[in-house]
Amino acid sequence: MSNYKEIVTKAVIGKGKKYFKNKYSVKSEVVPSTILGCWIINHKFKGYVQGDDVVVDGSFDINIWYSYDNDTKTNVINETIKYNELINVKSKLDVDFNDSEIIVRVLKQPSCGNVQINGNTIDFDIEKELGIEVVGDTKVKIMVEDDEDKWEVFDDNVTDETLEEIDNEVNENFLE
């Protein structure tokens, strides 16, 4: 005969991922001639629940290196860009995410592409991919068997004579 028990544990109760391609613009003090480089550093983010979705707030610093004055001088634009992304998270269970822990992972680091010069404005695209795991309480049912195998009991027939014999055979000066 068996019965079932429930174990309450933490597990991944929802997952999702999303690819983002966003357009941004920055202004330069002078009209750039050529874009020499674009890189992203200091990517920071955190996730939280909003309704049935997960929202990721984040920011990164973008550095755009450009030349100007007919490619005779260079300069770098440094700017912090903030973002707010909404990600739909799928769950096989009918659960409430409000008391859950949100784990955000970067599946593709933000990268800069398609950089164009429009007067003294530099337009560019940022691509990134984020993955979300929602960790919360869930229950696992396990089968527990009531029938246990009987343990075989061994009776040690140790007499006082046997114990005294063991004590006499022990050499206390074995290290010498």
Role assignments for model-derived ranges:
Residues 1-176:
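Viral structural modules
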